[in-house]
Amino acid sequence: LIKAVMSHPFFLNKGPISLVKVCDFLKIANQKKNEINFYDIKDLQSANKDSITFFHSKKYKEVAKTTKASFCLTSDLLKDFLPKNCEPIIVNNVLAAVARITEEFYPNSLEDEFDNKVLNIEDSDCKSVIHGKNVLIGENVEIGTNCLIGHNTIIEKNVHIGDNCKIGSNTIIRNSIIRNNVSILDNCIIGKKGFGFFPNKKKNLRYPHIGIV
């Protein structure tokens, strides 16, 4: 039986990834010799037996106790909070390990290329939205009712915006789901690369942002 890879609204999931490969990527010993596949990486609460999760802070110990994940990236100090059904994978730096595995599942999550297929809003399915001048819209964008969009704003592919939202001028929205009744001010950038990185001797390691932190 081939299981469907978990879908993601913005990035393509390249799973499954085996436990053997996870250990190879992280340069750690594989204590389990049997072949186990992971279909996604998820937070403690969302994870299931087919996904790998992570536990990096004691403040999440109550959630960790109830996780449904079969394996968890964690530290030696935190491993005893995990339930019996969840095997710890001990690493020196949990978040750096999460970044490395997330990059394998979602390699294009580290890219920050602009959407070169945007259209003028007048030529898109969102033309009925009240908008200013020079507004650009990507493919598969959904905008709810009673929304306003200011001048020179770009809303890139797959972005969903709820009802009663106000988007300011000179704003870029990418890789985002905006709920109802949200106001975004002028000159905002949402969904692009953030400040998530880990210092390294050779170069900074970028932390992929896929909505699990």
Annotate each predicted stretch with a short phrase:
Residues 54, 119-213:
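Structural signal for interior beta-strand "rungs" in well-ordered beta-sheet cores
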Residues 1-122, 181, 187-188, 192-206:
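Terminal amphipathic alpha-helical/low-complexity segments used for targeting or macromolecular assembly
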